[in-house]
Amino acid sequence: MSQTTVRAESGEPSRRAVLAGGAAVLAAGTLAAKAQESGRPGRAIKNGRIRQSIVAWCFENHWDMDQIARVAVELGCESVELVAPKHFPTLKTHGLSCAIGTVDMSPDPPFAKGFNNPKYREQVLKATTEAIDACSEAGYKNVICFTGMREGIPDDVGATNCVEGFKRIVGHAEKKGVVLCLEMLNSRVTDHPMKGHPGYQGDHTEYCVDIIKRVGSPNLKLLFDIYHVQIMDGDVIRRIKQHRDVIGHVHTAGNPGRGELDAKQELSYPAIMEALLEIGYRGVVGQEFIPTRDPKQGLREAVTLCDV
């Protein structure tokens, strides 16, 4: 029997039923209001308590960099992120920043090689140094970094190697005023190369946090990717509060599927954004979903939803 049909002996609805029904109506009303707001033209960001950014790679199949920048401005976002330094002038033309810079490990993706593997250490050091220098020169404050793939390396050895590698580069980051943000990625999803990363060593939140704390620098922090954390560890809001001191950047996407932040996915993004505000997070939230329909409408919905 549904809770909403349970009645007390008097024949009246039970208190639990009334409260449950009221909560459901309130939640539905809030989501409906957000959905209505997202359909309106103009700026999607009204409150501005959550600073927002568009992650470029997700939309490069739909728009060039100038178009991505124009969409960011239209929605009220302050940044387009994970872009190569050659695109920094385009961002500046539109009055945008790059909330977090990328590392060029081409021809491989940047997460494929990291400090966990000594044979890549010099390559990672060089690429990370170049990224730090480029972002510092442009006035941008964050650079992404990764553990790398396991390739047979035990987790404890990989962590120790990461600590040693980050200790070699973090002093340069401190000197340049740049924060390295270590991203945790999920290793479970196997049906798409950018929805999951089987073999990635830093595939749990606490594993990455341990590395960060062992390095012991304020210029190495955690990139808290809500989508990846949900898949591997869950308990997203509790982990945000638990690791409040080391969160340097945040990414979004709907789960399952890494799609839009809509009713087809399981994460409550307004509640998660409120948790970020509660811990005093002052960084940027990057919208990093892979669009399955009109990309601008999906972005408008996501930005509106996170504008708590």
Give the residues covered by each predicted segment:
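A short beta-strand-loop structural module common to alpha/beta enzyme folds
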Residues: E78-A84
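Active-site-adjacent beta->alpha loops and helix N-cap segments on the catalytic face
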Residues: F88-T90
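Histidine-acidic metal/acid-base catalytic patches
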Residues: S2-V73, E81, G139-K141, H192-P193, ...
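Feature marks short, surface-exposed loop/turn motifs that line or immediately flank catalytic pockets
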Residues: E60, K86, D104-P109, M149-E151, ...
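Active-site mouth loops of central-metabolism enzymes
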Residues: S53-W63, F111-Q123
